[in-house]
Amino acid sequence: MRFLPRFVTLLFALALFGHVLSFDSGGALRAEDIGELLQAATGDAVSDAKPEANHDEKPVTKEKKSDKSAPASNGAGKDAGTGDAESQPAAKESAKPKPKYPPYADVLKDSTKIDGLITLHRKGDLLLAELGSGQLNRDYIVLITIARGIGQTPILGGWSWGFGDDAVWQFRRAGENIQLVRRNVRFTADPGSPTEKALKVSYTDSVLFSLPIRTMSPSGACVVDLTPVFMSDLPQISLVMPGFTFAGNKSTWADVNGFAKNVELQVAATYASSGGREIDSVPDSRGVTVNVHYSISELPRTSYKPRLADDRVGYFLTVLKDFSKNESDDDRFVRYITRWNLEKADPSAAMSTPKEPIIFWLEKTIPFKYRKPIRDGILAWNKAFEKAGYYDAIEVRQQPDDAPWEPGDIRYNTYRWITAGVAFAMGPSRVNPTTGQILDADIIFDADFLQYWKQEYETFTPQGIALLTGGAIDLDEYRDEMRRMPEFMRDSHSTRCSCNMLGGVSREFALGAAVMASRTRSSAEMEKLTMQGLKECAMHEVGHTLGLRHNFKASSLYSLADLNDTKKTVETGIGASVMDYAPVNIMPEGTTQGDYFSTTIGPYDVWAIEYGYTPLKGGSPEAELPELAKIAARSGERELAYGTDEDARGIDPDPHSVRFDLSDDLVAYARAQAKVVAESWPGVVAAMTKDGEGYQRARRAFGTLLARHGQVMFGASKYVGGLNVSRSHKGDADAKLPLEVIPAEKQRESLDLLEEQVFNDEPFNFPPDLYNHLAASRWDHWGSEVVERGDYPAHEIILMWQDRILSRLISSLTLTRIHDGELKIDANEDALTTAELLERLTKAIYSEVDTVKSGEFTNRKPAISSLRRNLQRAYLQRMSYLALGQTSAPADCQTVAFAELGRLKTRIDTQLAGEAKLDGYSRAHLEETSARITKVLDARMMVGP
């Protein structure tokens, strides 16, 4: 029994040690710890006959045993027990276990503490965080936006960078490290089911960073350095900037803020390159700085009930894949709309105020004169919520000048007014990625959109013109764009807002100013235009924060006459929805002029809010489907037509699903706008230039007018080879076919317009003296933009627009659709064919070959003008590619092009041998054209089809 006390003591020591370990999951059992406990339990230095032995002697004994270099003592037994007065404290001190971490105070010395959702400490370039037990293994939603870009897509200030895939993070402890984990929330199954267990095996989370614990706080929180997380290419911007890499030594913190429910971080991230790739919008491509903003907040758990989406109504989506769904289902995707958790204060009432309204705060930085149109634009949405059963669903409040809170605090939905110099607006919202519930939202306006004369429209490149007109217009071009684009950026419009409306509205303001100045209208009229435009922008961005997507078909609701009838538009706006990109509505002089922009939300907006926010009975999202289907079944009504971003690309067929168009007849609209532009040319210099001023405003106004002419003509060209697209389902009232070929008569009407306004010199016959007044700005310093040519590049810019429209007409995709259309229309019905199209274009573009039969011409008065020669070269090049089979157009189109070139050569050769005395320019041009055609025809015969 003599060993029983030792055995009991040993068990107690081991139990005590295990208890200590339970408080430190990262602790490691060391050999010296085990030895110390065993020594205490078995009494190696103290016999079991002396249970009250001095415990302070043991470390000294241990230390002395471990100190082999200590000098021998004359009284070994006594010294071993007590030691002298000086050596004993030192022995005690050296015997203490070495601290696992440096002292908290030492690690955070000279740092600045930032309280908030996560306690931060900023220490020079370092950012440290305290992560307590309540912050580990919790879900945080992370929004990434470009706070300041480089002026090139997609790195534009204001753009959300999540591309529909906002991250959910967790901090997890793993030994002596804290792992930053991105959770996989896309896949789901019924809780507790075998399928859920299979999912856990099949899909894993991603560990992004492993951060060493630097120290422990007095409260037991782990202190880690977050600098490696954010001072990195975390957003993968380098993937869209080939040749650039993140340069940590050139990157800095732009802003660090903490709030009760969120953390806001902004990094001035610099990307370095060898300088071999030139970027026009930055001064030196060896160092490109992008301000990246990170917003981190906890993902709350609420009683919110998700609502299922319908493809006839335009909401942003939260998409999950549910493996518990029946295998008989078409797919396993579950699509929820994004919306606020709006609940009636009185659920039994047909109309009720909400328990908690959606409150927007106007930031104190908004200029006083603009607060009313912005307030009115936000509150305009209450009309739609009344249809859904709510009074005063939205409130607007003004942030006081002495408000103790900042706009970045997610407890406040703010309408912000900033000066980033980028002319953008966005309505970013924080959305629960598993339910679609909107948790908070902000609207950010950049004040530079009012500085519309800063835009240098005359410097448009072919790429810039392509962006103005929808991007790639051929499938090969589109596929190349997609291949170059990182996968995380593709196909994200349905889940995250990417809005460029304000930059376009800035151009519309510039157009309005140019036209009104040329008409000598009062400044009050321009003020009216500005205030209406500002209100429409506010309505548009608020719509995004409510969950609504773009609707680019909305502008086709009215005829030109009806959209200028204010008795109608005061109730509905000038289109069916404010979620379109609407141009300024300016009509030719002598015609009725209506509102310049929509002054209220439209019928589509009311219907969409009804779908998303009407309280419906049912304990689950699926139980609501019958009532939701009744609402969505109205989609066939004219004012409820819907087409969004993926319907408005350059490759898409619907001519009415485009940006900045207006009216139900794009040919009539283009003719009206061509007249507006033509009326403005003569007086543009005098109207835009005052005595003592330079001529740069006149130059910019000219570029603005020319751009409007090109845009509306391109829009009208989409009738050729176009299709009317409908989202209606089978059985919907007034449902249309999903796809209908544009009537041949309308396609030919479009070609008539283009022959008159694009493939003709007349619209571009400006007075020579006008060109000589179009001088560029002479300032050359940071913040200014120096154009490549101080003189106006007239031939170059006119040809850019002509070639853009021509490229669309004879793109392989347009030709394929026209060719397919012959099968989609009864043979007894009229149809435009590819043979007719190419024959018309050849005759129109080379009309001089037939019309110039006699006469004498000079280089100053040529038979074929310089603008026409440029157009003819562009057409010949594209027809040559087509005839040689170098495009993906149908084989029939290639043979038609071959035959058309053969006939053109015959006509050219006949003219060259005729009586007309051609000028040197025209003769050389035709001789070269004939020779080139010969080469193409010979090559075609050698290579074959």
Residues covered by each model-derived region:
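The catalytic-center signature of Zn2+-dependent metalloproteases
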Residues: 398-418, 532-588
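Positively charged n-region of N-terminal signal peptides that target proteins for export
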Residues: 1-6
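Bacterial Sec-dependent signal peptides at the C-terminal "C-region" and cleavage site
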Residues: 19-32, 39-40
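Sec-exported extracytoplasmic/periplasmic mature domains
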Residues: 379-390, 543-544, 548, 584, ...
